């Protein structure tokens, strides 16, 4: 090879390496392509790479070299393929996260043509060199895999070098698509782990770390890289709160540890001590620091950088004070199992502290017991990956689901606040020989090494453990404060299950969240499915990957209980839980390699239940009274009705405007004779018309809300508002979280922050103020010296407490519904 400016003999990772033109991989490190590329990168002025796919393991190996080159001003271009989905999204996100837009990263974009090049081109001051061969960017291909690559210089073969390089330039400039954030998100959202990836993983598993010394044990991997990138991007856009919705298996605690690593003082909140102890280990591994403490029980650490606190302790008012922590004490707060954040003690913590960023973590963000958690994080969900997506991406094992017809009759069982009573279920299950036989029969049919059965009560769990043990299947019952004949401590039960001293654990609410047993190969649903959230939590307990585990068997014993048709909808990842679709379960799309099989008797049952279903109006009214019962027989506001209403019913409301109570809530309450005396006065006067305008005014954008809030004025309602008052309300509204995104299309956060008061006011006048005057049925008028005014005949009603309550409720509900709708539209991209 003719003389180049590239380095020749160097130490790489303390290993003496001599430059060579022939690389064959295998066991001779001197023949690893990885080391030769590092040598070439040391003095390169420009780097061009074309490979058919990128793997996270390979990108991670080259990151430091890329960074060093970029910091020297080196231009880097990478062209890769998206054919068959072999390029891992995490590899692309890793480049974006660590190198930003300094690398020109593109996909080859010709769908009808195969794409299999593997070439690395380095340009120096006096010449260039090119590697041609078989290595894509993966750890195996760069190191010990049998990969043949050859290097030659433009000085020795100018003609052929020129042919390769000019072809690269043509492909890069004319047959590619830039991998920007939108393209990357699309690719990741649609990416399914290809079948060939399993074979690639065998050879690409980072097990030979001594060979390369480039792996770090605790570092972001897979979906964590994507989530970290999204969180950083979200904060750059002004977000101070965010929710990460991620199925079991991606390592949410480690994600929080990585994301919070740059912050000095961190608070981690969870509801169980064992979760806090596990989290402390994860944070210690990432931070490499002993500077952490606990805040629960008798431990009240306040002087450490990272505090792990139980919600039951920290959530007390006595501890939420300057004596322990000031509101600004923590820079970063993590709320684990964020679906609990609607509860009172969580709310105290969330409302007291003012961190730079608050991160919520959950696998099941849907409203727990009807409560809305998205509002707590300002409807900001930087990253989400559903159970279905996690299976499609190979993060979880597939399931084989068997819906088994159970003749148990639930028709006479009483419902309390929409749920079956524990006592009634016990009387139905315990001693039910036919049901024992059914469960045992199917357990034996799909016999497992390690199974988990979900029961309705302690007595039910004890009864099932006794029944199975008597039939020769060693089993235990796990529940809180256990003292039964077959009961066992949870940790001891897991140990026995892993050692195969027992075959089945029957549990009550002890394995719904926070505890996984990766070795489980069967879960059994032995009680009615009443909540999509609980169903997903319980299913998720068995979906963790484990050596030798190909899939999870799911046995679901379904009877004629309410919501019997939920299972197929949950399994398919359907967000709209319309139980009428249960009969069409074969038409639903399930995760890759999953199987769903329903007993034919169940299809008949679903059809029968469908015929008995209520009309839309009847369902809404029934839901209203259920919510009222939850509120101790108090008439719910719009916000409360939304908050506690089942998603399926709310979706009906949104689809059927005529029956939607949120569009004419006072009329809805009047029909049910639920209005108070003062509300009756409003209803039979001009107040009813004005309230209807606020309920139904068009909301394609959110601009009208800050104008209406300026009138509301924290309950001291104004008849007119000045430009200064409008401007204050307007900026306060759009400065909150990421609300600024609704200010204008294609505007960046930096541009928004530079906007002047004059520009803000101009926008307010030209849009919402103009349209309120034009479409507000004459209630909004011009008045000299003011930006906008209310019609004079409203003066008599604005002092009524009933009107103030109605206006506040409407503004809160409509603002919340707008951002909920925006989030749902964004999540479908």
Residue ranges and their predicted role:
Residues 381-452:
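Conserved interdomain linker/interface between the two RecA-like ATPase lobes of SF2 helicase motors
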Residues 236-259:
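Walker A/P-loop
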Residues 532, 541-575:
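Conserved segment of the helicase C-terminal RecA-like domain
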Residues 277, 294-295, 299-302, 319-321, ...:
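Conserved helicase ATPase core of P-loop NTP-dependent helicases/translocases
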């Amino acid at each position: 090879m003719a003389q180049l400016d590239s380095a020749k003999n160097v130490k790489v990772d303390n290993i003496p390496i001599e430059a060579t033109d022939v690389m064959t991989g295998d066991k001779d490190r001197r023949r690893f392509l990885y080391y030769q590329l590092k040598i070439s990168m040391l003095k390169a002025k420009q780097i061009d790479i074309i490979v058919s796919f990128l793997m996270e393991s390979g990108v991670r190996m080259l990151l430091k070299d890329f960074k060093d080159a970029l910091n020297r001003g080196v231009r880097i271009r990478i062209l890769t393929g998206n054919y068959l989905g072999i390029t891992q999204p995490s590899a692309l996100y890793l480049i974006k996260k660590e190198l930003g837009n300094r690398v020109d990263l593109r996909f080859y974009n010709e769908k009808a043509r195969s794409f299999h090049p593997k070439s690395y081109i380095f340009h120096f001051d006096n010449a260039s060199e090119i590697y041609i061969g078989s290595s894509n960017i993966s750890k195996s291909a760069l190191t010990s895999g049998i990969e043949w690559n050859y290097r030659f210089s433009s000085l020795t073969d100018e003609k052929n070098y020129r042919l390769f390089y000019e072809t690269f330039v043509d492909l890069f400039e004319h047959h590619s698509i830039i991998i920007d954030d939108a393209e990357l998100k699309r690719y990741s959202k649609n990416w399914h782990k290809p079948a060939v990836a399993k074979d690639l993983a065998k050879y690409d598993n980072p097990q030979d770390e001594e060979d390369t010394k480039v792996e770090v044990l605790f570092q972001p991997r897979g979906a964590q890289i994507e989530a970290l990138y999204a969180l950083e991007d979200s904060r750059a856009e002004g977000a101070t709160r965010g929710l990460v919705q991620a199925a079991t298996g991606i390592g949410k605690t480690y994600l929080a540890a990585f994301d919070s690593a740059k912050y000095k003082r961190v608070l981690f909140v969870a509801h169980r001590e064992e979760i806090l102890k596990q989290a402390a280990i994860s944070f210690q591994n990432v931070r490499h620091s002993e500077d952490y403490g606990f805040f629960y029980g008798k431990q009240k650490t306040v002087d450490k950088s990272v505090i792990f606190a139980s919600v039951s302790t920290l959530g007390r008012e006595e501890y939420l004070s300057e004596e322990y922590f000031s509101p600004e004490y923590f820079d970063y707060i993590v709320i684990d199992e964020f679906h609990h954040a609607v509860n009172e003690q969580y709310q105290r913590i969330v409302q007291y502290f003012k961190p730079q960023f608050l991160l919520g973590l959950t696998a099941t963000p849907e409203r727990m017991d009807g409560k809305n958690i998205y509002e707590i994080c300002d409807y900001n969900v930087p990253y989400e990956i559903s159970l279905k997506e996690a299976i499609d991406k190979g993060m979880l094992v597939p399931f084989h689901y068997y819906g088994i017809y159970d003749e148990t009759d639930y028709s006479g069982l009483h419902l309390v606040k929409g749920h079956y009573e524990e006592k009634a279920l016990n009387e139905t299950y315990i001693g039910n020989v036919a049901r024992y036989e059914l469960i045992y029969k199917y357990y034996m049919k799909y016999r497992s090494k390690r199974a988990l059965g979900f029961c309705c009560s302690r007595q039910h769990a004890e009864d099932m453990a006794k029944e199975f043990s008597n039939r020769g299947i060693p089993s235990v019952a796990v529940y809180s404060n256990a003292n039964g004949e077959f009961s066992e401590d949870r940790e001891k039960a897991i140990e026995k299950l892993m050692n195969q001293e027992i075959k089945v654990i029957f549990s009550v609410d002890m394995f719904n969240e926070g505890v996984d047993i990766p070795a489980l190969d069967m879960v059994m649903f032995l009680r009615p499915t009443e909540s999509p959230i609980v169903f997903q939590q319980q299913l998720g307990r068995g979906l963790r990957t484990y050596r030798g585990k190909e899939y999870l068997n799911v046995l679901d014993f379904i009877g004629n209980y309410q919501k019997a048709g939920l299972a197929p909808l949950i399994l398919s990842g359907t967000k709209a839980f319309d139980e009428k679709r249960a009969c069409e379960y074969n038409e639903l799309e399930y995760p890759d390699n999953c199987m769903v099989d329903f007993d034919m008797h169940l299809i008949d049952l679903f059809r029968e239940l469908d015929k008995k279903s209520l009309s839309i109006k009847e369902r809404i009214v029934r839901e209203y009274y259920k919510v009222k019962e939850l509120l101790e027989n108090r008439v719910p506001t719009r916000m409360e009705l939304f908050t506690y209403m089942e998603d399926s019913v709310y979706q009906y409301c949104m689809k059927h405007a005529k029956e939607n109570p949120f569009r004419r809530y006072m009329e809805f309450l009047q029909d049910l004779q639920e209005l108070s005396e003062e509300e009756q006065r409003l209803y039979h006067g001009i107040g009813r018309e004005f309230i209807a305008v606020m309920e139904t005014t068009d909301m394609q954008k959110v601009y009208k809300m800050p104008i209406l809030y300026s009138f509301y004025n924290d309950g001291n309602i104004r008849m007119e508002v000045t430009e200064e008052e409008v401007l204050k309300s307007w900026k306060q509204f759009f400065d909150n979280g990421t609300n600024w995104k609704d200010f204008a299309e294609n505007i960046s956060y930096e541009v928004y922050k530079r906007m002047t008061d004059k520009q803000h006011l101009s926008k307010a006048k030209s849009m919402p103020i103009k349209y309120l005057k034009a479409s507000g049925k004459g209630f909004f008028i011009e008045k000299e010296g003011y930006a906008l005014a209310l019609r004079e005949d409203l003066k008599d009603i604005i002092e009524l407490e009933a009107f103030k309550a109605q206006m506040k409720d409407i503004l809160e509900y409509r603002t919340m519904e707008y951002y909920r709708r925006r989030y749902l539209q964004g999540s479908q991209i």
